[in-house]
């Protein structure tokens, strides 16, 4: 059974944010924002890096089905080179929040750095994807989307072994 927590704030809509692709040498950085119902839980939902491809794909389907709202955004390699990977990761998270149709009242961010999002308080949680359901869900959506981008790059440039 998982030890993840359902939410951080005691009330309101809370979006979990995470990214994938910060350690990559190629491709975009991808971020996801996920708002889950307060009663959502799943015994196998955890940090996407701890899952198999099959588990991630199954949980991606489950998250998309049960989420109140979710969004995925990316920042391409050219922009990463222009502003640096940390700023690009945070930008991707902001872009994901921008795409949500529901306005969260609180943002739970995986990691220790984030630039304030307008009119929405946030809390940074180191290793948040192994502590909170919404961040773990965002971790899965971001990782699956990033892996899909790398697959496309591999098809176009097989000599690099993405």
Region spans (language model):
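RNase H-like, Mg2+-dependent phosphodiesterase core
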Residues: 1-162
């Amino acid at each position: 059974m998982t030890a993840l927590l359902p939410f951080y704030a005691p009330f309101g809509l809370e979006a979990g944010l995470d990214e994938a692709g910060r350690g990559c040498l190629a491709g975009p950085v991808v971020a996801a924002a996920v708002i889950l119902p307060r009663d959502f839980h799943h015994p196998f939902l955890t940090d996407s890096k701890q899952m198999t491809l099959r588990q991630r794909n199954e949980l991606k389907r489950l998250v998309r089905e049960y989420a109140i709202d979710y969004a995925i955004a990316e920042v391409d390699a050219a922009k990463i080179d222009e502003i640096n990977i940390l700023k690009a990761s945070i930008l991707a998270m902001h872009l994901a929040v921008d795409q949500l149709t529901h306005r969260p009242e609180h943002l739970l961010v995986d990691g220790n750095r984030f630039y304030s999002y307008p009119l929405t308080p946030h809390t940074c949680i180191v290793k948040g994807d192994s502590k909170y359901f919404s961040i773990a869900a965002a971790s899965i959506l971001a990782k699956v989307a990033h892996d899909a981008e790398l697959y496309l790059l591999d098809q176009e440039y097989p000599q690099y072994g993405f």
